[in-house]
Regions:
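Electropositive, surface-exposed helix/loop patches at the edges of structured domains
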Residues: 47-62, 125-149, 186-200, 251-270
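A conserved active-site cap/scaffold subdomain adjacent to cofactor or substrate pockets
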Residues: 116-164, 170-172, 180-182
Length: 293
């Protein structure tokens, strides 16, 4: 409301929209799901397309008009919701970085800007831990092929990154995603019996119960390894339960590196001067769990 009143004071005609009257959700207050049909109808009816509309992000309301929130990166998601409902030409979100980088400059001194990536690549990067764009923001835009521009509010004249429809073969520069303070857990069967689906299902149920977020999985006939985020320090309580059925080995304070479109040089960059505890490779992605020597 402050921005709206200021712009009106400056002679710029605006319409203030309390977003809670427009984005309708269920009652999961901290991570609400959007009622798209009702939201679309409300936004389409009330937003004046030839006027500057100002609203807030992150919020919605349920069927009883109680305030809800949209979860992590909810403000960016709000922009995506309005763009979808209004069939916008594009969306721009403003960050404290030049755009989407191929690596975090804090950890990689030669990090470079990705000027153009596909929706698919952006969602893959977000899944593995990149924090600039949340997948929820991209999903409604991808459905209607609305381009997303990620730009810097510190240097607004920089070109930033465009996320849009395109072939993933266009961007093959390796991208590095880093997750620090991880916990690597290795479970082995005590009697050399196979670790089967029912064992894995039980393990995952325990991880969910103790709020451990799984970021990597690797299994063999008689062992099962996971790299997890123990944000609440619950592994100390989970370990005795797991130890009743499995031999438990674990390494604390490890780092998980994910390399999209990896090559030998990229892998060497990550592994240099580190102890590699686990490595997993697929067609486009390499994940490496390391510990400092």
């Amino acid at each position: 409301t402050i921005l709206s009143h200021f712009m009106s004071f400056m002679g710029i005609k605006t319409q203030w929209l309390d977003v809670r009257n427009f984005i309708k959700t269920n009652s999961n207050y901290r991570d609400a799901e959007v009622d798209w049909e009702l939201t679309q109808a409300t936004i389409s009816k009330n937003v004046k397309k030839k006027m500057l509309n100002i609203t807030q992000g992150f919020l919605g309301s349920d069927e009883n008009n109680f305030t809800t929130t949209l979860g992590r990166e909810g403000s960016d998601y709000t922009a995506g919701i309005f763009a979808y409902c209004l069939n916008a030409e594009s969306v721009t979100i403003w960050k404290d970085v030049p755009g989407v980088m191929n690596a975090d400059p804090r950890y990689f001194e030669n990090a470079s800007l990705l000027s153009h990536i596909s929706y698919r690549e952006a969602i893959e990067m977000a899944f593995y831990g990149a924090t600039v764009i949340h997948p929820k923001t991209l999903q409604p835009l991808q459905k209607k092929e609305i381009p997303l521009y990620v730009k810097s509010f510190i240097n607004p004249m920089l070109p930033g990154t465009c996320v849009s429809k395109g072939s993933d073969s266009e961007w093959q520069i390796p991208s590095f995603i880093v997750k620090r303070d991880q916990l690597l857990i290795s479970l082995s069967s005590i009697d050399f019996s196979f670790i089967m689906e029912e064992n894995i299902s039980e393990i995952f149920a325990l991880f969910h119960q103790f709020k451990l977020k799984v970021n990597l999985i690797q299994n063999s006939a008689i062992s099962f390894s996971v790299c997890v985020e123990d944000k609440f320090g619950n592994f100390k309580d989970l370990n005795p339960i797991l130890s009743k059925k499995f031999k438990v080995d674990f390494d604390e304070n490890v780092t998980l590196y994910t390399i999209r479109h990896f090559n030998d040089k990229a892998a060497q960059t990550v592994e240099q001067n580190k102890t590699v505890l686990l490595k997993q490779v697929s067609r486009e992605t390499m994940q490496i769990v390391t510990k400092e020597k």
